[in-house]
């Protein structure tokens, strides 16, 4: 039986650092919201079988997304944190039978709307059949400094350091177990949850274009990248 690839996009955050009058995933760039651009990446990819977006129960913007993508599942069962939102989404996928424990879940940041299709293909091809799963990541290029107040306290050896990106691909059953803990403090991505089970996910070469919209100035770069597609 073919293993399904299911994109899960947690979109329950408010994007406080972005400083807009709405969550950053609903900021419009061109004629579409950031979230619509992100969903389109997965909907256009032939290896992705289903896309699920998990939003806050209080979300008032999601209806537009559902109208634009009627085939996408938009669920209002997001949690207080990213980890809780992903946990709720994976649990519902398993409960409804839309995913089996052996299917792949590709968790992707709603605010990474410039993911190149070739990077997504690379992740699926290299990690899709790996029991330990894998994530997109790029080697750290800049020199890193530790700070003590406003002063440098140390320079960090960067040889073995990678910057994690998304999607992060794991079997549904593994991800469900990894996020089952009552206390998810310190879990900043799916890989960190899986690592707590002793699993060592694969590092798959990511792409510098796969940036996360975080600060207002990021919108300028994102707009240029989207215009170049």
Curated annotation (Swiss-Prot):
<keyword id="KW-0548">Nucleotidyltransferase</keyword>
<protein>
    <recommendedName>
        <fullName>2-C-methyl-D-erythritol 4-phosphate cytidylyltransferase</fullName>
        <ecNumber>2.7.7.60</ecNumber>
    </recommendedName>
</protein>
<dbReference type="Pfam" id="PF01128">
    <property type="entry name" value="IspD"/>
</dbReference>
<dbReference type="InterPro" id="IPR034683">
    <property type="entry name" value="IspD/TarI"/>
</dbReference>
<dbReference type="InterPro" id="IPR050088">
    <property type="entry name" value="IspD/TarI_cytidylyltransf_bact"/>
</dbReference>
<comment type="function">
    <text>Catalyzes the formation of 4-diphosphocytidyl-2-C-methyl-D-erythritol from CTP and 2-C-methyl-D-erythritol 4-phosphate (MEP).</text>
</comment>
<feature type="site" description="Positions MEP for the nucleophilic attack">
    <location>
        <position position="212"/>
    </location>
</feature>
<dbReference type="InterPro" id="IPR018294">
    <property type="entry name" value="ISPD_synthase_CS"/>
</dbReference>
<feature type="site" description="Positions MEP for the nucleophilic attack">
    <location>
        <position position="158"/>
    </location>
</feature>
<dbReference type="InterPro" id="IPR029044">
    <property type="entry name" value="Nucleotide-diphossugar_trans"/>
</dbReference>
<keyword id="KW-0808">Transferase</keyword>
<dbReference type="InterPro" id="IPR001228">
    <property type="entry name" value="IspD"/>
</dbReference>
<dbReference type="GO" id="GO:0050518">
    <property type="term" value="F:2-C-methyl-D-erythritol 4-phosphate cytidylyltransferase activity"/>
</dbReference>
<feature type="site" description="Transition state stabilizer">
    <location>
        <position position="24"/>
    </location>
</feature>
<keyword id="KW-0414">Isoprene biosynthesis</keyword>
<feature type="site" description="Transition state stabilizer">
    <location>
        <position position="17"/>
    </location>
</feature>
<dbReference type="GO" id="GO:0019288">
    <property type="term" value="P:isopentenyl diphosphate biosynthetic process, methylerythritol 4-phosphate pathway"/>
</dbReference>
<comment type="pathway">
    <text>Isoprenoid biosynthesis; isopentenyl diphosphate biosynthesis via DXP pathway; isopentenyl diphosphate from 1-deoxy-D-xylulose 5-phosphate: step 2/6.</text>
</comment>
<comment type="similarity">
    <text>Belongs to the IspD/TarI cytidylyltransferase family. IspD subfamily.</text>
</comment>
């Amino acid at each position: 039986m073919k293993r399904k690839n299911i994109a899960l996009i947690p979109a329950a955050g408010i994007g406080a650092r972005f400083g807009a009058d709405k969550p950053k995933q609903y900021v419009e760039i061109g004629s579409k919201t950031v979230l619509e651009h992100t969903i389109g990446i997965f909907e256009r990819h032939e290896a992705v079988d289903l896309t699920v977006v998990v939003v806050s129960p209080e979300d008032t913007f999601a209806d537009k997304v559902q109208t634009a993508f009627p085939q996408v599942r938009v669920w209002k069962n997001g949690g207080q944190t990213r980890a809780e939102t992903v946990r709720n989404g994976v649990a519902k996928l398993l409960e409804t039978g839309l995913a089996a424990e052996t299917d792949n879940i590709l968790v992707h940041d709603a605010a990474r709307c410039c993911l190149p299709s070739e990077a997504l293909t690379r992740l699926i091809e290299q990690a899709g059949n790996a029991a330990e799963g894998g994530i997109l990541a790029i080697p750290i290029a800049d020199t890193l400094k530790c700070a003590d107040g406003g002063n440098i306290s140390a320079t960090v050896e960067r040889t073995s350091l990678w910057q994690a990106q998304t999607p992060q691909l794991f079997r549904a059953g593994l991800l469900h177990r990894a996020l089952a803990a009552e206390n998810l403090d310190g879990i900043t991505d799916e890989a960190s949850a899986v690592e707590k089970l002793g699993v060592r996910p694969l590092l798959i070469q990511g792409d510098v274009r796969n940036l996360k919209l975080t600060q207002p100035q990021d919108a300028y770069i994102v707009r240029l990248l989207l215009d170049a597609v």
